[in-house]
Amino acid sequence: ILVEWNQKMNLTGIEDEKEVFIKHFLDSISAVSKGYIKNGMSLIDVGTGAGFPGMPLRISLPDLKVTLLDSLNKRINFLQEVANQIDIDDIEFIHGRAEDFGKDENYRECFDIATARAVAGLPALMEFCVPFVKVGGHFVCLKGPNANLELEESKKAMEVLGIEYIEKIDIKLPEIDLDHNILVFKKVKN
């Protein structure tokens, strides 16, 4: 579906089906491997774009309550069409900006998990995502080869936002030599 729609509108720079599967789907569900994201939890995917990692996480965990947030309506329309085609009717789709919805009492501190992938540098990403997370919940972000540097640059943001660094998980994807990481943080205060 993604490859087909990508011909009409730019959703991803990756167009080969096998690459889409490995770099988008497998990369997205790798966040499940350590048990931070489980069935029964509530998750918001901030800046979801073409639905990564939120949509693959919902497909692989059918009882995960997922909210997909993106500032571009064309992406939200695409994701609604995908959900219809694969018969998933319990995802919430939000067209809007994280900065606005993170202040909304209907969304602020309402989620067990906030995720993001390829949205912004880590300090800004924390400011976008952490307001959605309940105290005791986690911010789980997928980052590339500069994860350690971004982590160093985020110490002040972590302190201000009330989160603690838990771990960096190195991700190895089949047939592709990419340096991908998952950074996990726990919200300890609001």
PLM segments and residue spans:
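Class I SAM-dependent transferase core
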Residues: 1-40, 44, 74-91
